[in-house]
Curated annotation (Swiss-Prot):
Protein name (Swiss-Prot/TrEMBL): 3-deoxy-manno-octulosonate cytidylyltransferase
Keyword vocabulary terms for this entry: Cytoplasm, Lipopolysaccharide biosynthesis, Nucleotidyltransferase, Transferase
InterPro entries xref list: Cytidylyl_trans, KdsB, Nucleotide-diphossugar_trans
Keyword check for Lyase: no
Main localization (coarse): cytoplasm
Function: Activates KDO (a required 8-carbon sugar) for incorporation into bacterial lipopolysaccharide in Gram-negative bacteria.
Entry superkingdom: Bacteria
Disulfide bonds, paired cysteine numbers: none
Recorded catalytic activity of this chain's protein: 3-deoxy-alpha-D-manno-oct-2-ulosonate + CTP = CMP-3-deoxy-beta-D-manno-octulosonate + diphosphate
């Protein structure tokens, strides 16, 4: 059994009030919560800094925790929740992003099961990259891993660098590229330790929070997602695209 916590910060720079954005008659955060509830989680909690988000979640039959508005990351918000609820150190927590209303419930369960079956402090997922444009896109985070399935590095750069191929052309790629999906599973005790660590230099260079874990010598298990998630919502254009998808479901 595992618990899903959905961080939902209200003051998005590019899309203010994003958690409450209407998607086919329901707030986005409720759409995400409904997916999480179908994952097999024993409990689903929305962690937010906004009273209106709390009210929307509760009105939809969900559970919400009002958190400090000054957190620097979603992981810090998770830490506040696990301490408020006094979760045991062994409890598996899955961090589902609050702006992914199309996240497949299958992969929420998958990442929790992957963590339960490995020795890493943290687990996440990836999907194969087939398109050269995506491989060279710094907004698509790439990951390389060892033969046991543990992350060696995450980067916005194109890794691994196909030296022989890219000398000739960058219009095609091989089968060596994986895009990281922003879903994480951890044990509650690991989150408590994580937030005590100082940010790492690599994390600050790449602006990738997960690099702190590797910097401090911990392992991250990377599984290949059973199903690729749909687009997340970062901009008004993303929101329009998501609304169109829901009208067709």
């Amino acid at each position: 059994m595992f618990t899903v916590i959905i961080p939902a910060r209200f003051a998005s720079t590019r899309l203010p009030g994003k958690p409450l954005a209407d998607i086919h008659g329901k707030p986005m955060i409720v759409r995400v919560m409904e997916r999480a509830k179908r994952s097999g989680a024993g409990r689903v909690i929305v962690a937010t800094d906004n009273h209106d988000v709390v009210d929307a979640v509760v009105a939809a039959g969900g559970e919400a925790c009002l958190t400090n508005e000054n957190h620097h990351s979603g992981t810090e918000r998770l830490a506040e929740v696990i301490n408020k609820y006094q979760f045991s150190d062994d409890e598996i927590i899955v961090n589902v992003q609050g702006d992914e209303p199309l996240i497949p419930e299958e992969i929420i369960k998958q990442v929790a099961e992957n963590l339960a079956g490995c020795k890493a402090g943290m687990a996440t997922l990836a999907v194969q990259i087939h398109d050269a444009e995506e491989a060279f896109n710094p907004n698509a985070v790439k990951v390389v891993m060892d033969k046991q399935g543990y992350a060696l590095y995450f980067s916005r750069a194109t890794i691994p660098w196909e030296r022989g191929r890219f000398i000739q052309s960058r219009e095609t790629i091989g089968d060596n590229f994986l895009r990281h999906i922003g879903i994480y599973a951890y044990r509650a005790g690991f989150i408590r330790r994580y937030v005590q660590w100082e940010p790492s230099p690599l994390e600050q260079i790449e602006m990738l929070e997960q690099l702190r874990v590797l910097w401090y010598g911990e392992k991250i298990h990377v599984g290949i997602a059973l199903k690729a998630p749909g687009v997340g919502v970062d901009t008004p254009e993303d929101l329009a695209a998501i609304r169109k998808v829901f009208t067709e479901i």
